[in-house]
């Protein structure tokens, strides 16, 4: 597999009234990579109060990890209904990533990079342009549509379209896709100009838009806490693409791997 990395902020999550715990795309991706025995480098960011604990947790994954600190740690409160639909509140907005936070020297061997923003403010177009130099980017659509404001999480399509020029693969949850295109057919997402788009439907699988075709990939039914499943799917998908799988094959592989991960059967 070609060199793979994940970059994104960590979060402080409160799930269904529980004690705060570490979260964020880079964390859930790291856990998935460890469980699936896939190698990658992790670049993460958080506020100073969480630095020591979060560094320890990243180190425990056994993956090479660099933790940058600055500003607040992004905070969320969330709950799930019986269908796995999540309701979220933004408790704190973290500091954006800047180009200096991920040194070119650290990224020089990386060919496939999963960019895992929590909110729209995490990565601007200039930072993403630098990250995309010489590598393929899978970008989580949270970084397009999640409004960076404290309170109930708001999604809208008011993002900088210049970001799209630097994205090779765009991963969107269905509600994120709807924030962009409204009630239009999901196939209309191809008008964004991103070569490869994957829309996920939680417990109902995904849709792959690539190479001029739209292909539904069914999910594997599991009874488990779905927190982090989208991040695990994204990094497993990118690992499949880095390993030479075509888009639909990578989605099927990622679906099976995430189901195994959620049910504790990952290799």
Please report, for each region that a protein language model flagged, where it lies by residue:
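Short beta-strand scaffold segments in enzyme catalytic cores
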Residues: 31, 76-79, 206-209
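Conserved N-terminal subdomain of the carbohydrate kinase-like
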Residues: 2-4, 11-20, 35-116, 121, ...
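Alpha-helix C-terminal capping segments
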Residues: 30-39, 240-243
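Active-site metal-binding loops of divalent metal-dependent hydrolases
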Residues: 8-10, 232
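Conserved beta-alpha-beta core of the PfkB/ribokinase-like small-molecule kinase fold
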Residues: 112-187, 205
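Short, charged, surface-exposed secondary-structure boundary motifs
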Residues: 76-77, 146-151, 224-228
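Conserved phosphate-binding/catalytic region of the ribokinase-like
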Residues: 154, 158, 184-267
